[in-house]
């Protein structure tokens, strides 16, 4: 669902320096990638992986925000491990 995809990206990118046009481009790119799989039903985990990859290339803060929900972080240690695993703990 394109609208749900756009809402997810908007939540992650809220108050970040990313223009509405960039978000629309992300939605289009992810939608094309998902359609290219040729499947009628796509697991939410696959959609989440595509969103994570797109966000990482655009805004690391939005990437971590999305990951915190998608990967169900419960404690600060979850954030720390994720940041370390992704090599994002140095800045």
PLM regions with names:
Residues 1-91:
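Long, C-terminal-biased catalytic regions of enzyme "large/alpha" subunits
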């Amino acid at each position: 669902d394109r609208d749900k995809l756009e809402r997810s990206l908007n939540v992650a990118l809220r108050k970040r320096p990313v223009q509405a046009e960039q978000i629309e481009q992300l939605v289009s790119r992810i939608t094309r990638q998902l359609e290219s799989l040729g499947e009628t039903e796509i697991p939410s985990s696959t959609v989440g992986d595509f969103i994570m990859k797109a966000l990482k290339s655009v805004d690391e803060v939005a990437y971590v925000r999305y990951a915190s929900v998608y990967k169900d972080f419960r404690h600060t240690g979850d954030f720390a491990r994720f940041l370390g695993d992704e090599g994002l703990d140095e800045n």
